[in-house]
């Protein structure tokens, strides 16, 4: 049968059916979703229209995440999927999609911070210097060992899981959303 992106199968406004006057075409082709899971890296190549390639990530465990306020990007491990505005099912099954909120390992960012500023993030003696550079909400996450981040790439299409560390108003927004979900 095949997945088709046509509109010939749709009904009219009145509820009647349109007469089907042609077969499915290759250019109307659709494919099943990749539903990229959290696990050891497994990426497949898919030939698309025009001979282009899409990289269908079936499993991913790491990606490039950038820390916007410090202007630094590091490859880090994705630990868990914690929130998805689209569906709770995607959180339960740990599916990586664009705009999913995940927790990432903060170790690469800690190492960069130490080499760049010469101060450790959790050092109590240098707390005044760190406080001016890193907000308190982010420091709490660094000490807990889990940074909240948002996926900005499309793992099912480009085969990568890249994103950015949540900060400021956006971090507060998603924290409120997750707290609300926990209470319900």
Swiss-Prot record:
Region (Disordered): 1-23
GO BP annotations listed: translation
Bias kind Basic residues: ranges: 7-23
Pfam families referenced in this protein's UniProt entry, alphabetically: Ribosomal_S8e
Entry keyword set: Ribonucleoprotein, Ribosomal protein
Listed GO MF terms: structural constituent of ribosome
PROSITE patterns: RIBOSOMAL_S8E
Entry's Gene Ontology cellular component terms: ribonucleoprotein complex; ribosome
Family: Belongs to the eukaryotic ribosomal protein eS8 family.
Protein name: Small ribosomal subunit protein eS8
Organism taxonomic ancestry: Eukaryota, Sar, Alveolata, Apicomplexa, Aconoidasida
